[in-house]
Amino acid sequence: MTKKQLHLVIVTGMSGAGKTVAIQSFEDLGCFTIDNMPPALLPKFLQLVEIKEDNPKLALVVDMRSRSFFSEIQAVLDELENQDGLDFKILFLDAADKELVARYKETRRSHPLAADGRILDGIKLERELLAPLKNMSQNVVDTTELTPRELRKTLAEQFSDQEQAQSFRIEVMSFGFKYGIPIDADLVFDVRFLPNPYYLPELRNQTGVDEPVYDYVMNHPESEDFYQHLLALIEPILPSYQKEGKSVLTIAMGCTGGQHRSVAFAKRLVQDLSKNWSVNEGHRDKDRRKETVNRS
């Protein structure tokens, strides 16, 4: 049996340079992440990792918050070099001293190495101690001029493989306004102005995924006209959402009860967007009325 390859990114660098944003970015890229991993525990942790998927990916922040960081990190890295089945890279985040001082002042935090309270002294000492590690790093990112969003984009470009680069996902869902707008929706569209199958006895207990209801909703001229305008609005903006580093875009279609019109529209939208994007389909309230009837 072929041993599975373990991919590891060790995130380190200057305090205040953006390691928290970085580890969140790796999580969005599908990595298992841990913040503030003590260096001495790293080799043992990697041995204990239960590999359940092919090509598992890890991203761990290892920095000077661990008191033994400077004394242990070199020996740990040497050990990792000799570990079979491990592909690891070091990501070092840096920023100009002036910018780091400004960030510390903004958060009103003290630098962990500033014994006398002077932030700049702590930064200079940390930079000196981290110089060997920076020289060993395969990826050095200067975050001085980067916003958190720009840093996420930079890391995605550097560390995404082809599959991850396409990890932008669209969630299309239907819902009923009577039960509230989904709190995680990015785009919300209201189709309550369309003819309602609820008032037809033969369609009332069916849903928009059923062909008779779907055809009833979508075959109305106003439905087709609105849908084409909707598609023309949504399709051009999807690349911009992806470019901005958004990992999931949730599009919610709403009608009164979330059983007929919104379900049909969500189904149609999924069919079209799936031609070029990764799309998931969901119907929050589709069966809610049925569940209510069964309980009564």
Curated annotation (Swiss-Prot):
For the keyword Nucleotide-binding, the answer is yes
Signal peptide annotation: none
Q: Which residues bind GTP?
A: D63, M64, R65, S66
Key words, A-Z: ATP-binding, GTP-binding, Nucleotide-binding
State the source organism's domain of life: Bacteria
Write down the InterPro entries for this protein, in alphabetical order.
P-loop_NTPase, RapZ-like, RapZ-like_N, RapZ_C
Binding-site list for ATP:
G13, M14, S15, G16, A17, G18, K19, T20
User: Does the entry feature the keyword GTP-binding, yes or no?
Assistant: yes
Q: Which molecular function term from Gene Ontology is one that the record holds? A: ATP binding
Give the NCBIfam families listed for this entry.
PRK05416.1
Q: What does this protein do?
A: Displays ATPase and GTPase activities.
Q: Which family does it belong to?
A: Belongs to the RapZ-like family.
Name recorded for this polypeptide: Nucleotide-binding protein SPJ_1472
Q: Which organism is it from?
A: Streptococcus pneumoniae (strain JJA)
